[in-house]
């Protein structure tokens, strides 16, 4: 059994119904969290199967092996060996998620055979070529998005199965990498949830004196900018036109990202990759 974690340390509890027919998946770029080791031990006592992806030779690795679970060492690049990894660091998500995709494919919970994983890798390579630092802003969607968000509060609206998690990931990356706040919601609920926000003090036309602001001495006021992430609509049904109308009716600029056609995981990969690049460019620009 594991010792008690220090006061204030994060702890996780299994739901009361978890038992021998359940599978616990643990993913972390750290592996030293006492709470996760305790969670693996709790799962073992409940009869749950435990699978974890984390750095090798960590307390979590030992706990999972002690629980007779499956431990998969997290893949890292050579330059990442010394630097601490954060959950939103570029590349960390896929190093943690890819083993789970393969495992869940084998268990039948989703479809991600080797050819799908190869397509995901190809899509990520393609985005890296389009969004890399050597590509000029005018043809680089990530640099363009970062420039548009430089002095804005990102209001992230998502539509579609893949866009939802990509939007939440983008908000997390903005906060963790560049220290920037944002709000995120799914369409069509976002239209009602954020309507007042777009008409309040964050609206583009909220400060009439901004026209006379000293551009050198006074920092720009923070205004909202809608970022619309969406999958290709099925059957032509989409709330995107209403979203554009709402934003424009409040003089709020809007940025849109729509992935190329493909499977759900491929489109998810593209949206995450582009927004990850944008978050990194914002972090570099702000010196975070």
Feature annotation, model-predicted:
Residues 268, 272-288:
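C-terminal functional modules
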Residues 1-126, 231-234, 241-251:
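Glycine-rich phosphate-binding loops that contact phosphosugars or nucleotide phosphates
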Residues 26, 153-159, 225-229:
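Short hydrophobic beta-strand segments
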Residues 219-275:
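C-terminal hydrophobic structural anchor segments
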Residues 1-2, 53-55, 74-76, 180-192, ...:
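A generic structural motif
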Residues 86-89, 105-216, 288:
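Active-site phosphate/pyrophosphate-binding segments
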Residues 35-44, 210-237, 281-288:
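Extended, charge-rich low-complexity interaction segments
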């Amino acid at each position: 059994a594991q010792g008690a974690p220090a006061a204030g340390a994060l702890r996780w509890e299994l739901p009361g119904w978890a038992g021998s027919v359940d599978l616990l998946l643990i993913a972390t770029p750290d592996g030293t969290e006492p709470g996760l080791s305790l969670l693996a031990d709790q799962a073992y006592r409940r009869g749950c199967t435990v699978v974890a992806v984390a750095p090798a030779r960590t307390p979590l690795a030992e706990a999972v092996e002690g629980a007779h679970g499956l431990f998969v060492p997290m893949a890292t690049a050579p330059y990442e060996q010394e630097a601490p990894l954060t959950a939103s660091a570029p590349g960390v998500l896929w190093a943690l998620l890819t083993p789970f995709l393969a495992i869940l494919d084998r268990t039948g919970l989703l479809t991600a055979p080797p050819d799908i994983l190869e397509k995901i890798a190809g899509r990520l390579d393609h985005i890296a070529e389009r969004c890399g630092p050597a590509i000029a802003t005018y043809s680089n969607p990530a640099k363009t998005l970062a420039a548009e968000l430089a002095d804005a509060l990102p209001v992230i609206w998502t539509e579609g199965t893949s866009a939802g998690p990509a939007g939440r990931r983008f908000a997390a990356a903005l906060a963790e990498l560049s220290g920037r706040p944002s709000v995120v919601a799914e369409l069509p609920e976002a239209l009602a949830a954020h309507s007042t926000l777009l008409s309040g003090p964050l609206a583009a036309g909220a400060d009439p004196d901004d026209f006379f602001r000293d551009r050198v001495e006074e920092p720009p006021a923070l205004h909202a900018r809608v970022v619309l992430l969406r999958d290709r609509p099925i059957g032509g049904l989409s709330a995107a036109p209403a979203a554009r109308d709402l934003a424009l009716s409040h003089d709020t600029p809007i940025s849109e990202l729509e992935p190329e056609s493909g499977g759900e995981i491929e489109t998810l990969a593209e949206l995450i990759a582009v927004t990850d690049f944008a978050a990194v460019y914002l972090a570099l620009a702000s010196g975070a």
